[in-house]
Amino acid sequence: MIKKNNESWLIVGLGNPGKEYERTRHNAGFRAIDVLADRLGCKIDRLKFQGLYSQVNYEGKKVFLLKPQTFMNLSGRSILQLSAYFNIPPQRIIVLFDDISLPPGRLRIRADGSAGGHNGIKSIIAEIGSQAFPRIKIGVGAKPHPEQDLADWVLSSFSSKEEKDLCSALNRSAEAALCIIDHGVPEAANRFNGSTP
C-alpha cells in the first residue's frame, strides 16, 4: 500500500469548462494538460471528483491528469477530492496554469509559494491547506493597458503571434511536468525557467 502511494502523482491543468473559454488566456492550463495527455497516449474523459480525469502509468509511477470542472475560482475542491481519495500529498501535485506576469511562450517553475493573485491557485491553497505544491506557470502576457479589466483580459484570446509562442510553451510545460516527476523541481526549473519559444 505504501509503495503505491509513493508512486502516485497528480498533474492538474487549470481552466474554465465550456467551448466559449477554450482558447482564452485563462485556459492555458487546460490546453497544457491536453498536450501532456496526447504525449502520454491517454484521454482526460472520466467524470468524477468534480472534474475530468485520466490515470496512466508513467515510468512505473501512477499518474493522474485532472481538469477541474468547477470553474477556475473553485478548482481546489476538485483537486482536494482526487488527492484525498488517492492519498497524494501536496508535494506530488503539479499544477499548470496561466500567468499574466510572463510573456506568452515563457515558463516559470516553482516548488511552492503564494497564490500571487491567481484565484485558481488561491482556491487550491485554501482547500488542501498547503502552498507546498509544485507549479508550472505558463506566460499569457500582461494587460496592454493598466486600466483594462483583468477578468476581460484573461478571458480574451491570443493574437496569432502569441498563439504560436503559447503552443511552444504548452509543449515545454508538458515536458517540464514529466521532468519534475523524473528529476525533481530544481532540475526542471533549471532546464525550463526562462526558456523561450
Predicted features by range, described:
Residues 117-120:
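Hydrophobic alpha-helical segments within soluble ligand-binding/sensing domains
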